[in-house]
């Protein structure tokens, strides 16, 4: 399971011109589900996302996690994170989980996150437009 996290001042996701998820300060989490992923991996990734210290403290050091910084999560599914780009000029998505399995784990990740922190989401398998203002920029690839 892959989480590409970006520290943001704000982020929102739209589907067909309608905002379906929006946060102010926090983390945009682009979530990629791979074959073999399960709820245990989702739990482990969520704990890492929630505890990863990417927000600055009073001395300007990255010592605070999203909860300590008073932030939120915007979780957006992104199957392209599971792409294999090693061969040729077209990505292969053979490592990605089947859509039904990926959706179930995406929803599970969202539900578990929402129990711990204010969380918004995109819409699984939709054509989404994601807007954000990076803060830093600060971006990390987390893989479980």
Curated annotation (Swiss-Prot):
An aminoacyl-tRNA editing enzyme that deacylates mischarged D-aminoacyl-tRNAs. Also deacylates mischarged glycyl-tRNA(Ala), protecting cells against glycine mischarging by AlaRS. Acts via tRNA-based rather than protein-based catalysis; rejects L-amino acids rather than detecting D-amino acids in the active site. By recycling D-aminoacyl-tRNA to D-amino acids and free tRNA molecules, this enzyme counteracts the toxicity associated with the formation of D-aminoacyl-tRNA entities in vivo and helps enforce protein L-homochirality. SUPFAM superfamilies: DTD-like. It is an enzyme of class 3 (hydrolase). GO terms for biological process: D-amino acid catabolic process. This is D-aminoacyl-tRNA deacylase. Belongs to the DTD family. Keywords: Cytoplasm, Hydrolase, RNA-binding, tRNA-binding. GO terms for cellular component: cytoplasm. One of its GO terms (molecular function) is Gly-tRNA(Ala) deacylase activity. It is found in: Cytoplasm. A motif (Gly-cisPro motif, important for rejection of L-amino acids) lies at residues 136-137. A Gly-cisPro motif from one monomer fits into the active site of the other monomer to allow specific chiral rejection of L-amino acids.
């Amino acid at each position: 399971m892959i989480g590409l996290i970006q520290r943001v001042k704000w982020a929102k996701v739209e589907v067909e011109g309608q905002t379906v998820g929006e946060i102010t300060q926090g983390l945009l989490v682009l979530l990629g589900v791979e074959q073999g992923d399960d709820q245990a991996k989702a739990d482990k990734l969520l704990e890492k996302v929630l505890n990863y210290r990417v927000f600055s403290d009073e001395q300007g050091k990255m010592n605070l996690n999203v909860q300590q910084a008073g932030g939120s999560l915007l979780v957006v599914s992104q199957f392209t994170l599971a792409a294999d780009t090693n061969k040729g000029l077209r990505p292969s998505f053979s490592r990605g989980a089947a859509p039904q399995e990926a959706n179930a784990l995406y929803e599970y990740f969202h539900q578990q996150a929402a129990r711990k922190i204010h969380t918004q989401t995109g819409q699984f398998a939709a054509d989404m437009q994601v807007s954000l203002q990076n803060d830093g920029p600060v971006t990390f690839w987390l893989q479980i």
